[in-house]
Amino acid sequence: MLIYYIISLIIVGIDQLTKYLTVQNIPLHETLEVIPSVLSFTYHQNTGAAWSILEGQMIFFYIVTLIVVGVIIYYMHTQGKNDKFFAFSLSLILGGAIGNFIDRLFLQYVVDMIRVEFIDFPIFNVADMSLTVGVALMLIYLFFDEWKEYRQKKVGTK
């Protein structure tokens, strides 16, 4: 179980390091091109969630994040100890949630910097990537878990 908390901690560390480097090296709203027309870093301060929804609702984000962290820890110890894939997806979600929570708590906004140039997509950060991949893996897990359960019931009814 400890390994999954270590994974979360590594994600938080990488997230906070990239945010620190962004703030120290890129002026607010300025862009540093990495791969022209593909990838750049743009320092952005987001007071909301994805696409800046719920902008300025910090108390709401504090409460939701604390609930999510509590639920993740609960499931990590109840379900995660029996399934590594499930625990890994939870560790990604936990790391991402804590990474953005730290920003909201101390800065009142989230530092975003990664910009994909070839599509119209919001600027994001390492915590956002971790959350997204964790949720995607969780959905895959839930789909296959339900499928397995369905197949077992189907075989059991014959």
Question: Where in the sequence are the language-model features?
Answer:
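Alpha-helical transmembrane bundles and membrane-interface segments of multipass inner-membrane proteins
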Residues: 1-158
